[in-house]
Amino acid sequence: MEVSRVRALRGPNLWSHDTAVEAIVSCTTQELDIAQLPGFEARLRALFPQLSPLQPLGNYNAAPMAQVLELAALGLQAQAGCPVTFSRTTPTLETGIFQVVVEYSEEAVGRLALELAQQLCRAALDDAPFDLAGALHQLQELDEDVRLGPSTGAIVNAAVVR
């Protein structure tokens, strides 16, 4: 899996009214269906047990690695306490190329979550360790550093509404 052209969507956009990180993700032939990767999902769940289901119930379509990246980036932010709920993976016209969009509350946190999600996927593929507690701590620390405080945030939000 290769991630290219990561960009921040800083307002209402094609995908959502919320801010989001958009990435172009290239998957190898084997990564187009994670069911074809023996033991991958079990290793992934061992590394990140709180990860949401990789496929909705009743959906029997192949789940590409890009979708795993999407759910991992969203899940890492949510576990770190960020108020995020939206993500989407859409195939492009080119086989194996996907657009991955993940909501963020703070841009730096969203970008870091995408990087950490890549590391998580790579660790699950390689059957290597992944420091989940460290990753969540990193995201929480960054979120606290860049997020506006409650009173400043209220002032900024009121100004934006005007």
Name the predicted role of every residue range.
Residues 1-162:
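Preference for protein termini
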